[in-house]
C-alpha cells in the first residue's frame, strides 16, 4: 500500500512538472495576440499612407487643446501664452489665483508642468513621424519629405516655447524607443536654439514644402515655407540677430504673404473676423471650429459672459502693452487723451 502511495505521489509530481513546463512554453512572447482590435497599433501606422497621414495630423492635434478649449478658464494649460509675458494682468479679485501674472509662481506649479507636458507631446509625436514615415510603402518621396518638414517645424515651435520659458531643456531629436533613451540631461539654451534653427532651415530648404497655401486650399492651415521663415525670424530676434531676422521676414513676403488692406481704414479690425481667417496676412493660424462648446482661448479669458458659455474676463491687457501701440495718426499713445489726469494718478487710484 505504501509503495502504491509513493508511486502515485511520483506520478502527480511528474505530471505537475510537465504541466508547469507546458505552461511556461505556452506563455512565450508570441502566445498572445497583443495587437489591439479597437484602434491602430503603433507598428501598423507606417504600413499605409492613410495611416501615416493620420499620425502627421496627430502632431497638429496638440494645438486643439491649446487654442480651442471647450471647458474651463482656470486650467493652466489653457491660459494664453500672453500670461507668461509682460503684456497681461489680472483683476484684483482673482490675483491670488493667477500667480503667473504676479511673478509668484514656483517651479512646481502646474502652470509650468502642464506647458512642459504639452510641448513635449508635440516633440514626441513629431519625432515619431520624422523617424518612421520613411518606411511607408505607398507614399511618394515628396509626400514623405513634406511631412517631415512639417513635423520639424512643429518640433521647432515646441522647443522655441520651451527655450523661452526655461532657457535650456532636454533635447530629444529622435523617437524614444526605450526607457534608457528617455532620460536625457538638460541641454544648454544655445544648443536648443541651434537645434531649432537647424529644423527651420531644413524646412525652408525643402523643395516639397510649398511657400504658401491659397485660401480655400484643402491643405490650408498646414506648415509652409512662409511659416518657417516667420518662425525662424522670431528665433533670430530672440538671439538679437537683427539682420538675419529682417532677411527672413522679407522672405515671408516673397512667399506671397502680405498685410490685409482690403477693408481700408478698418482692415486691422476686419482682419480678426472669421471671413478673413485665410487672408494673405495669416501666416500660420489655427482655423475656427464651428462646433458648439468650442471657443478661442482669448475669447474665454478676454471675453464676457456670452463667450464659451459663462466665461469671465479676468485677464486684462497690461497698460504698458497698450502704451506700446501708436495711434491711427502715428502719434505715441497717451492715456491722458482718453483718461484725463491718468499720468498724475497714484498707483492705488
Segments (PLM) and residue ranges:
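An aromatic- and glycine-enriched ligand-binding surface/loop that stacks and positions planar moieties
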Residues: 28-92, 193, 201, 207, ...
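Secondary-structure transition into beta-strands, especially the periplasmic turns and strand N-termini
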Residues: 4, 24-26, 137-152, 239-251
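Short linear capping/connector segments at secondary-structure termini
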Residues: 37-41, 104-105, 173-181, 214-217
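Conserved, well-structured interaction surfaces
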Residues: 48-68, 89-166, 181-183, 187-194, ...
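Short coil/turn linking the two alpha-helices of tandem helical-hairpin repeats
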Residues: 163-164, 170, 238-241
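Glycine- and aromatic-rich loop/turn segments at beta-sheet edges
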Residues: 168-175, 205-217, 259-266
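Sec-dependent bacterial lipoprotein signal peptides
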Residues: 2-25
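Short, compositionally biased low-complexity segments
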Residues: 26-35, 95-99, 169-170
